[in-house]
UniProtKB/Swiss-Prot annotation:
Keywords: Ribonucleoprotein, Ribosomal protein. It holds the Pfam family Ribosomal_L27. This is Large ribosomal subunit protein bL27. GO terms for biological process: translation. Coiled coil: none annotated. PROSITE patterns: RIBOSOMAL_L27. InterPro entries: Ribosomal_bL27 (IPR001684), Ribosomal_bL27_CS (IPR018261). Belongs to the bacterial ribosomal protein bL27 family. It comes from Flavobacterium johnsoniae (strain ATCC 17061 / DSM 2064 / JCM 8514 / BCRC 14874 / CCUG 350202 / NBRC 14942 / NCIMB 11054 / UW101) (Cytophaga johnsonae). GO terms for cellular component: cytosolic large ribosomal subunit.
């Protein structure tokens, strides 16, 4: 007979924390300079006019304006900012 009670070990509890990726400012919405437009892994969306990409592939607005998503001839998605009229 066992002199110690058999203790099971859990096989749960390993799920990683979500990274909150995705589009943060959609097409037609306003953005100010420095705003995060898209958080992504890899370049799913590419930077267009007035948008820059950071080292983790996040797209940011370079100037204040309206966000525009478009696909070009190469069928890649590009994100641009159309500046507000001064």
């Amino acid at each position: 007979m066992a002199h110690k009670k058999g203790v099971g070990s859990s096989k749960n509890g390993r799920e990683s924390e979500s990274k909150r990726l995705g589009v943060k400012i959609y097409g037609g919405q306003a953005a100010i300079a420095g705003n995060i437009i898209v958080r992504q892994r890899g370049s799913k969306h590419n930077p267009g006019e007035n948008v820059y990409i950071s080292k983790d592939h996040t797209l940011h607005a370079r100037v204040a304006g309206v966000v525009k998503f478009q696909k070009k001839r190469d069928n890649k998605s590009y994100v641009s900012i159309i500046p507000f009229e001064a």
